[in-house]
Amino acid sequence: MIYKVLFQADKTQSPLREATKSLYLEANSAVEARQLVEDNTPYNIEFVQELTGEHLAYEQESEDFKLTEF
């Protein structure tokens, strides 16, 4: 499954909606996706969302859509 992870780049600062970034990754569950990001980045994870169907197709049309591998 493909997940979209919304995050802040710095854990030491208060989250700002305007500074929220995203990455996409393939994992077996949302828990695994969160763990992969926590283990491999210094990011403050806000939300992990599974992408399926039309939502996945919409995200794949974006030029920012790239699967992250750790």
Curated annotation (Swiss-Prot):
RNAP is composed of a core of 2 alpha, a beta and a beta' subunit. The core is associated with a delta subunit, and at least one of epsilon or omega. When a sigma factor is associated with the core the holoenzyme is formed, which can initiate transcription. Belongs to the RNA polymerase subunit epsilon family. Pfam families: RpoY. InterPro entries: RpoY. The keyword DNA damage does not apply. It comes from Latilactobacillus sakei subsp. sakei (strain 23K) (Lactobacillus sakei subsp. sakei). Its EC number is 2.7.7.6. It is an enzyme of class 2 (transferase). Keywords: DNA-directed RNA polymerase, Nucleotidyltransferase, Transcription, Transferase. The keyword Transcription applies. It catalyses: RNA(n) + a ribonucleoside 5'-triphosphate = RNA(n+1) + diphosphate. It comes from the Bacteria. One of its GO terms (molecular function) is DNA-directed RNA polymerase activity. A non-essential component of RNA polymerase (RNAP). This is DNA-directed RNA polymerase subunit epsilon. HAMAP family: RNApol_bact_RpoY. GO terms for cellular component: DNA-directed RNA polymerase complex. GO terms for biological process: DNA-templated transcription.
